[in-house]
């Protein structure tokens, strides 16, 4: 194994005093962790960057690590002694092996986010493999069939929150179509010294536990002055009836989170060097558990060239929002011999992550003030004058029977909350749908999925000229949403919001990226129109902190079944007041944003409040695949399904 910045058997831990091990009193505990003496101390403010490992064969060790990001001692879950873990660099066309050894006292796992691979290598305990028991080693064997910016993380309980995350860069086998002089990974995450089990318990008992910006009497009179007393009272009563607050932007906030950039708190000021005139590629990865970040580099425009590992037509912006688990690659080109701040503020404006681009180490730039804290509106609850579709007008269809023998897909998933009390809905495959057999079907026997769109990729199936790929179909599953214990509200109106940058970003005077801007650089590889539609409502009860699809938590829901080779449209309707980043394992999600053959391929899609989003899926890889909200505590509160491709 070739290891950049790190010799074999040594860990890379250039840490600052903000991240030191717990002094001489902790010496026994440190020795017990058996890091081979590889511990470092540095001066306050010294930055650290994860190691980079490149090649075909990798050895990763998962263990506990004493850390101090905040001035308080805590314990992280580290990979090779680092939080985040080492940057892994793979190459398209190679077959890589990753031997993961678990030195924790509990089971662990690594999921390779958005990597197309055999289902038994996906790393989801209880679904695709048993997990990695304490003291054991599991070897992942992955044929690499794509390129781009990705990441990896644990799929075991809350280990992602405690630091088991890292960047994964897959280099294109051919010459990269993106022109740049140097590159940096910018890995964002949200750190807390609080035990995640405690956070989850707090949210279950009081969903706004971490909301320190509740409405006050002055807020009410300010709203009344803006829109009149009667509308202000009406809105106030509406929020009260729903047991919600317009200030509840993020479930977990800077009240407990410290926002890190490449493992550095803001004071540590991670710095990337450049020479004026260079084209710098910044690979942004949101590896946080619960935080949407709004990214800008004051003084520089950013040209977005890749989204979720797939090339897009360049679009120049001042700012973009990155949801949990999303990745964006941008090009910046500073011309002056000066420093620039990389500024990442969470949606609720409760803190920030910060780094610097500079010609020399030690240079800094001004940190901009945070934007005003946004507030939800009745529009976010589907109660504004939006001219959207009423819930009663949504198409429905008859119920299909689920295929028996799928108990594995409903078992408890790595400690997930599996309580339930609502009726069952089942999404099943139509055995008469158009499929492709024998063409690129990926499984563990050696066949591969459809290729990723690229400069040398030809569509496997030509685009249909006679069918409208975005025409509405009758959903193959019945959806009748009613207010109840697991569904606190149902929007009167929903709409497409692809041109909306998101709450807190409209009208801020900056050019902000939207999903409507994303146009794939290369034509999609599967031109067939979908033959059926699966409609899913994102539902929840904020007060009880229950989340799910179609009013159901994971334990009460049958798997969504797809026939191998079929092409399906997923329609997501957000009935809640929060954004949800929805991630389907194992398969690409082709976002229907109006670009037809050039709709962008994504792996994680943000669905805004009261929004309807649709995307196409080619079921080209068999297996049991996780499908869930990537807000970690939402997933564990029930917003999880299994998709079975067979």
Q: Where do the model's predicted regions map?
A:
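Histidine-centered copper-binding motifs that mark active-site loops
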Residues: 2-15, 22-324, 330-331, 361-448, ...
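Surface-exposed, short loops/turns at beta-strand junctions within beta-sandwich domains
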Residues: 146, 334-336, 621
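N-terminal pre-domain segments of enzymes
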Residues: 44-54, 58, 461, 466-469, ...
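Conserved "landmark" site that anchors the functional core of diverse proteins
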Residues: 274-279, 321-326, 492-494, 501-507, ...
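Active-site pocket scaffolds in enzymes
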Residues: 69-71, 114, 120-129, 303-318, ...
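Short, aromatic- and glycine-rich surface loops/edge beta-strands on solvent-exposed regions
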Residues: 150-156, 339-347, 625-629
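Conserved small-residue hotspots that stabilize compact domain segments
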Residues: 302-303, 327, 331, 335-358
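Predominantly extracellular/luminal regions of secreted and cell-surface proteins
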Residues: 58-63, 227-239, 513-539
């Amino acid at each position: 194994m070739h290891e950049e910045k790190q010799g074999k058997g040594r860990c890379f831990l250039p840490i600052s005093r903000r991240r030191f091990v717990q002094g001489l009193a902790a010496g026994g505990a440190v020795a017990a962790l058996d890091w081979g003496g590889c511990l470092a101390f540095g001066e306050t403010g010294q930055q650290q960057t994860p190691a980079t490992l490149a090649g075909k064969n990798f050895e990763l060790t998962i263990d506990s690590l004493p850390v101090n990001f905040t001035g308080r001692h805590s314990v992280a879950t580290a990979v090779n002694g680092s939080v985040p873990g080492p940057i892994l660099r793979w190459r398209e066309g190679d077959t890589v092996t990753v031997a993961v050894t678990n030195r924790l006292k509990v089971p662990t796992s690594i999921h390779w986010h958005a990597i197309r691979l055999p289902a038994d290598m996906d790393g989801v305990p209880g679904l695709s493999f048993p997990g990695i028991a304490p003291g054991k080693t599991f070897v992942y064997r992955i044929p690499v069939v794509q390129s781009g910016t990705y990441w990896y993380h644990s799929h075991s309980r809350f280990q992602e929150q405690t630091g088991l995350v890292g960047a994964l860069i897959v280099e294109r086998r051919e010459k990269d179509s993106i022109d740049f002089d140097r590159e940096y990974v910018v890995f964002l995450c949200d750190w807390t010294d609080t035990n995640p089990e405690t956070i989850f318990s707090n949210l279950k008992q009081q969903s706004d536990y971490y909301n320190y910006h509740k409405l006050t009497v002055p807020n009410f009179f300010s709203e009344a002055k803006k829109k009149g007393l009667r509308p202000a009272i009406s809105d106030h009563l509406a929020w009260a009836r729903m047991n919600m607050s317009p200030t509840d932007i993020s479930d977990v906030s800077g009240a407990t989170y410290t926002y890190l950039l490449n493992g550095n708190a803001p004071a540590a000021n991670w710095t990337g060097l450049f020479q004026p005139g260079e084209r710098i590629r910044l690979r942004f990865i949101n590896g946080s558990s619960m935080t949407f970040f709004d990214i800008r580099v004051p003084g520089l425009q950013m040209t977005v060239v890749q989204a979720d590992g797939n090339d897009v037509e360049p679009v120049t912006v001042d700012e973009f929002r990155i949801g949990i688990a999303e990745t964006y690659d941008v090009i910046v080109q500073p011309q002056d011999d000066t420093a620039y701040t990389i500024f990442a503020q969470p949606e609720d404006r409760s803190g920030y992550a910060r780094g610097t681009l500079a010609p020399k180490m030690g240079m800094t730039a001004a940190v901009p003030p945070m934007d005003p804290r946004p507030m939800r509106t009745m529009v976010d609850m589907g109660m504004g004058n939006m001219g959207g579709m009423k819930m009663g007008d949504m198409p429905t269809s008859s119920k299909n029977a689920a295929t028996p023998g799928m108990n594995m897909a409903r078992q408890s998933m790595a400690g997930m909350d599996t309580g339930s009390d609502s009726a069952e809905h089942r999404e099943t495959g139509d055995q008469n749908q158009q499929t492709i057999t024998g063409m690129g079907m990926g499984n563990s026997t050696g066949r591969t999925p459809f290729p990723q769109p690229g400069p040398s990729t030809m569509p496997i199936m030509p685009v249909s000229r006679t069918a409208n790929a975005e025409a509405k179909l009758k959903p193959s599953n019945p959806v009748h949403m009613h207010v109840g214990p697991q569904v606190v509200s149902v929007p009167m109106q929903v709409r497409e919001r692809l041109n909306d940058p998101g709450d807190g970003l409209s009208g801020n005077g900056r050019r902000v990226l939207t999903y409507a801007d994303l146009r794939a650089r290369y034509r999609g590889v599967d031109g067939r129109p979908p033959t059926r539609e699966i409609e899913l409502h994102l539902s929840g009860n904020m007060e009880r902190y229950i989340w799910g699809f179609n009013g159901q938590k994971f334990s009460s829901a049958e798997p969504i079944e797809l026939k191998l080779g079929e092409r399906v449209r997923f329609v997501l309707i957000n009935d809640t007041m929060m954004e949800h980043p929805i991630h389907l394992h194992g398969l690409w999600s082709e976002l229907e944003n109006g670009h037809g053959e050039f709709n962008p391929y994504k792996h994680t899609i943000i669905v805004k409040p009261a929004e309807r989003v649709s995307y196409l899926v080619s079921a080209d890889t068999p297996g049991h695949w996780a499908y869930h909200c990537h807000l970690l505590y939402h997933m564990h509160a029930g917003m999880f399904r299994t998709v079975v491709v067979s």
